[in-house]
Curated annotation (Swiss-Prot):
PANTHER family: 3-ISOPROPYLMALATE DEHYDRATASE SMALL SUBUNIT, 3-ISOPROPYLMALATE DEHYDRATASE SMALL SUBUNIT 2-RELATED-RELATED. It comes from Mannheimia succiniciproducens (strain KCTC 0769BP / MBEL55E). Heterodimer of LeuC and LeuD. Its EC number is 4.2.1.33. This is 3-isopropylmalate dehydratase small subunit 1. The lineage of its organism: Bacteria, Pseudomonadati, Pseudomonadota, Gammaproteobacteria, Pasteurellales. It catalyses: (2R,3S)-3-isopropylmalate = (2S)-2-isopropylmalate. It comes from the Bacteria. Pathway: Amino-acid biosynthesis; L-leucine biosynthesis; L-leucine from 3-methyl-2-oxobutanoate: step 2/4. GO terms for biological process: L-leucine biosynthetic process. The keyword Aminoacyl-tRNA synthetase does not apply. NCBIfam families: leuD (TIGR00171), PRK01641.1 (NF002458). Catalyzes the isomerization between 2-isopropylmalate and 3-isopropylmalate, via the formation of 2-isopropylmaleate. It is an enzyme of class 4 (lyase).
Length: 202
């Protein structure tokens, strides 16, 4: 995974409440045998018209928000089924962080496991951020994971993050990579443990 320390990029507001995983990644894009091309499916019914042409009214299709790496979202984002494809698609589309007041539990875990940071802030703070990024002149913000703050034209907002998830994101490690990073410690423990308890080794 890519490391996440300090990222400065465009942010797009998508403030609808209860955006579920079927909206994020419609079911017809779950049929592949690998993860390739899932970015095409992200918000498909919002991004494209029935004839397949881009919907010019959709925020991510508008020139001022194209290439956004952050989404400022409404409450309970990612509710619905637990399809991990939704997060894979967001990551392929270039989304590095989601900023909102609440996220569905399994979706939140899937995000952090796949290198997408979820940031929870208060109702007042999300309104402030959404207002800021709704203006093309101020829609570039910074997310400082090490300092745990969102930096906008109108000030900075602190956020909490699980220490373990933070370390994994900063180092760009998934669960397997994080475990392998402690290989020497694991082997040292194993050696000393079986030396002290030889009857346990088969």
């Amino acid at each position: 995974m890519d490391k996440f320390t300090l990222i400065t990029a465009k942010a797009a507001p998508m403030m609808a409440a209860n955006t579920d995983t079927d909206v994020i990644m419609p079911k017809q894009f779950l049929k592949g045998i690998d993860r390739k091309g899932l970015d095409r499916g992200v918000f498909f019914d919002l991004r494209f018209n029935l004839d397949g042409t881009p919907n010019e009214k959709f925020i991510l299709n508008q020139a001022d928000w194209q290439g956004s790496q952050f989404l400022v979202v409404g409450p309970n984002f990612g509710c619905g089924s637990s399809r991990e494809h939704a997060v894979w698609g967001l990551k392929q589309l270039g989304i590095r962080a989601l900023i909102g007041t609440s996220f569905a539990g399994i979706f939140n875990d899937n995000c952090l496991r796949n290198g997408v940071l979820t940031i929870c802030v208060s109702d007042q703070e999300i309104e402030q951020i959404a207002t800021t990024v709704s203006n093309p002149a101020t829609n570039t913000i910074s997310v400082d994971l090490e300092g745990q703050k969102v930096l906008t034209e109108n000030g900075e907002i602190a956020f909490d993050v699980d220490p373990l998830k933070k370390e994994m994101l900063i180092k760009g490690l998934d669960a397997v990579g994080f475990t392998l990073s402690m290989k020497d410690d694991i082997l040292a423990f194993e050696q000393s443990y079986f030396k002290a308890n030889p009857w346990l080794k088969l």
